[in-house]
Amino acid sequence: MKWFFVCLAVVHALGCHASASAQSGQKLVAAYSSLSATQATLWLAKEAGAFQRHGLDVDLIYISTGTKMVQALVGGDIKISQVGGAAPLAARLRGAEIKIIAVAFNTLALSMITQTDIRAITDLKGKRLGISRFGSNTDFGTRYLLKKHNIADRDVTFLQFGEAQAIFAALQSGTIHGGVLSYPTTALAIRKGFKELVDFSDVGIEFPNSEVVVTDRFLQSQPDMARRFLMGYAEGLHRYKTDGAFTKRVMGKYLRVQDQAVLDETYNLFAPKMPRIPYPTLNGIRLALESLADEPRAKTAKPEEFYDDTILRNLEREGFFRQLYR
């Protein structure tokens, strides 16, 4: 796929690919879907050498939409993906044989940022709102917020911008009245004088964010590789929670943010909320299914069909996480 090789070129340009001197191990390509703090577990595991310690030589690439991510996963271009939102569930409902095996963040790590003249959520009626993509976390969060305050989708104009930085730019230019952003872009927007109308993490929405997704085929044919990947991933999560200096340095590299105050704020907000064991939750997946109202099977599908936490449960039973956090 042409776009796949373009993504590889972008990663090389950003300096986020594996170096030629990386230790030998089983080669594996993994992808992440957004430039936000919730995606950092994967970066941390890579930069800390956690995957190498478990015999894996992991290359990371960036694929900016859930749809393309699933295409790459099903097509075999990547073996493992870290993606936010309901895209993996929608793909499975349509026949893609993929499953969630871990979730690094089980709530919406987003904020509705608006122009200063927006004083209440009801003021969003009739306004232009920025999201990343239809079907994304930003899309779901916006529609959830509007529905909760009796504002119909047709009463606002949704504009897609791709990444949080582009939504922020649209706010600055006045193209939109509000937009859903993720950290650290949220912190930058607040510093520029824009208003944080809603912090979704305070709303208490349980929703799968930063899911680790694989194909059924990979899970069945390469269970040991999947296990070793999750062990390295869990070590990345441990570094997130326990090593602020390293985490902020890695975030700065991948997010291309140099402002130390913004990195400090981002880390202090997210590190305490990251789980020790990245289990998916039934309630989160159930709500994600409810967000897929246009999918005929979503109403009757069972959350258990969409994830397999066997590896995590086995690791916990064997004492892996207890040893990690001793």
Predicted features along the sequence, with ranges:
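Short, glycine-/small- and polar/acidic-enriched structural segments
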Residues: 22-173, 177-183, 196-200, 205-206
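Pocket-lining segment of extracytoplasmic ligand-binding domains
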Residues: 86-87, 165-255
